[in-house]
């Protein structure tokens, strides 16, 4: 039984040593005292540990349908790729949960790392980011072109894991269930299929270096990065439950696909149904592992990527939808920024299509839309905060193509 110490002679907290004059309250027990500050601290520690335990237990994996529904809120089009990614991610984390709970029925479930092929600006990185956000797991992006095999100047492959650790605030257990997206993976392809004549060390060597972490290994990760601190203690991270998604544009692989399909690409041959479906827009969806091998990825590397999907090139209609439809669409973001200045913002259909056409002309895809709309909006966002008489700003096609002034609808005009 605990009792109040008010009125007692001076006593001290048995935990922190503070006297009752230094704290608001001290509670006495049989031969022990505890102050209000230590009670609060104990409660915080217990609450935090309970929350962490619950989070570990409650790692519910959304169904593929739920994942696609979430992706639809942020990513326009690419229906086939969304389904493929949703199923692969669901199976991966179902496997992780089974391994953690021991419910694997003595059957070894292998990793389902993913290769995503798609033109620049088609949404490869954004899809991977969105998956990590939906699953609430740490996420890191690496650029394959910066990686080198051991012994050469550049980044070690272990630095990829370091980025994931940093995203997880160095919580190793969380990092071991994260997602890593490796971009520009096509840039580490061998320069020639005949390695005895041309051995591309920076390409094939990096592929070889990535094999172990893709499959699952205990990686020794330098917390300070790289080779500049050889005396640092390494952090051990098990990569067997980390989902790796690799992406690249694979420029020129269309030619390899067309050569393999031969006459079928123009509608001849026995499999006419498949032939009629092959177009310049969807040809990447017909890429098979043999095409990647011919492109320059080594067989062992391709074997670590059992799931493969392709993104279609975005056309004008796709880019207009990307500008306007997602929850975080660029148009909605800029409308909110202008609303915070007390005005409204409208883009005409001509303006939206002009921005989409400009992104296509620059071959930047969706990723180029931000810089285009920022350029269009720069003067508006500079002038508007100093004006209180503007009811609405209208951006039309000429604002995009000729950099003309937008139309300002003044509050007095609306009233009249």
Swiss-Prot record:
Gene Ontology cellular component annotations, sorted alphabetically: HslUV protease complex
Entries under SUPFAM superfamilies matching the protein: Glucocorticoid receptor-like (DNA-binding domain) (SSF57716), P-loop containing nucleoside triphosphate hydrolases (SSF52540)
Keywords: ATP-binding, Chaperone, Metal-binding, Nucleotide-binding, Zinc
Molecular function in Gene Ontology: ATP binding; ATP hydrolysis activity; ATP-dependent protein folding chaperone; protein dimerization activity; unfolded protein binding; zinc ion binding
The keyword Metal-binding belongs to this UniProt entry's keyword annotation: yes
Protein's UniProt name: ATP-dependent Clp protease ATP-binding subunit ClpX
Subunit composition and interactions: Component of the ClpX-ClpP complex. Forms a hexameric ring that, in the presence of ATP, binds to fourteen ClpP subunits assembled into a disk-like structure with a central cavity, resembling the structure of eukaryotic proteasomes.
Matches recorded under HAMAP family: ClpX (MF_00175)
Binding site for Zn(2+): 13, 16, 35, 38
ClpX-type ZB domain: residues covered: 1-54
CDD domains: RecA-like_ClpX (cd19497)
InterPro entries: AAA+_ATPase, ATP-dep_Clp_protease_ClpX, ATPase_AAA_core, Clp_ATPase_C, Clp_protease_ATP-bd_su_ClpX, ClpX_bact, P-loop_NTPase, Znf_CppX_C4
PANTHER family in the record: ATP-DEPENDENT CLP PROTEASE ATP-BINDING SUBUNIT CLPX-LIKE, MITOCHONDRIAL, ATP-DEPENDENT CLP PROTEASE ATP-BINDING SUBUNIT CLPX-LIKE, MITOCHONDRIAL-RELATED
Keyword DNA-binding: no
Any GO BP annotation: proteolysis involved in protein catabolic process
Family: Belongs to the ClpX chaperone family.
Name of the gene: clpX
Transmembrane segments: none
Role: ATP-dependent specificity component of the Clp protease. It directs the protease to specific substrates. Can perform chaperone functions in the absence of ClpP.
Chain residues that bind ATP: 119-126
Pfam families: AAA_2, ClpB_D2-small, zf-C4_ClpX
């Amino acid at each position: 039984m605990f009792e109040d110490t008010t009125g007692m002679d001076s006593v001290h907290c048995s935990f922190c040593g503070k006297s009752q004059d230094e704290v608001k309250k001290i509670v006495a027990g049989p031969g022990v005292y505890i102050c209000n500050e230590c009670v609060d601290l104990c409660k915080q520690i217990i609450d935090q540990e309970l929350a962490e335990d619950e989070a570990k237990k409650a790692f519910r994996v959304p169904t593929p349908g739920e994942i696609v529904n979430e992706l639809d809120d942020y990513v326009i089009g690419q229906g086939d790729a969304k389904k493929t990614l949703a199923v692969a991610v669901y199976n991966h984390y179902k496997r992780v949960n089974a391994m953690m709970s021991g419910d694997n029925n003595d059957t070894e479930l292998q990793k389902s790392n993913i290769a995503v092929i798609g033109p620049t600006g088609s949404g490869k990185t954004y899809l991977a980011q969105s998956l990590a956000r939906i699953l609430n797991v740490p996420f890191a992006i690496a650029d394959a072109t910066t990686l080198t095999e051991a012994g050469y100047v550049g980044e070690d492959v272990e630095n990829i894991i370091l980025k994931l650790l940093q995203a997880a605030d160095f919580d190793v257990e969380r990092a071991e269930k994260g997602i890593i997206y490796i971009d520009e993976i096509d840039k580490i392809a061998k320069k020639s299929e005949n390695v005895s004549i041309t051995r591309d060390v920076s390409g094939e060597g990096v592929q070889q270096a990535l094999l172990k972490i893709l499959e699952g290994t205990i990686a020794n990760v330098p917390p300070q990065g790289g080779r500049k601190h050889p005396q640092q203690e390494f952090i051990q991270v098990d990569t067997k439950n980390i989902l790796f998604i690799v992406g690249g544009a694979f420029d020129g692989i269309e030619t390899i696909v067309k050569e393999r399909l031969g006459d079928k690409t123009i509608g001849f041959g026995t499999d006419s149904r498949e032939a009629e479906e092959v177009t310049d827009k969807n040809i990447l969806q017909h890429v098979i592992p043999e095409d990647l091998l011919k492109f320059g990825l080594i067989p062992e590397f391709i074997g670590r990527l059992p799931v493969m999907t392709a993104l279609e090139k975005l056309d004008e209609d796709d880019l207009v939808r990307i500008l306007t439809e997602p929850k975080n669409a660029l148009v909605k973001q800029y409308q909110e920024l202008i609303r915070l200045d007390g005005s409204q913002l409208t883009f005409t259909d001509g303006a939206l299509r002009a921005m989409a056409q400009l992104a296509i002309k620059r071959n930047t895809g969706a990723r180029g839309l931000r810089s285009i709309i920022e350029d269009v909006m720069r003067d508006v966002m500079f002038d508007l905060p100093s004006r209180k008489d503007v009811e609405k700003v209208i951006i039309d096609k000429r604002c995009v193509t000729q950099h003309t002034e937008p139309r300002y609808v003044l509050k007095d005009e609306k009233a009249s």
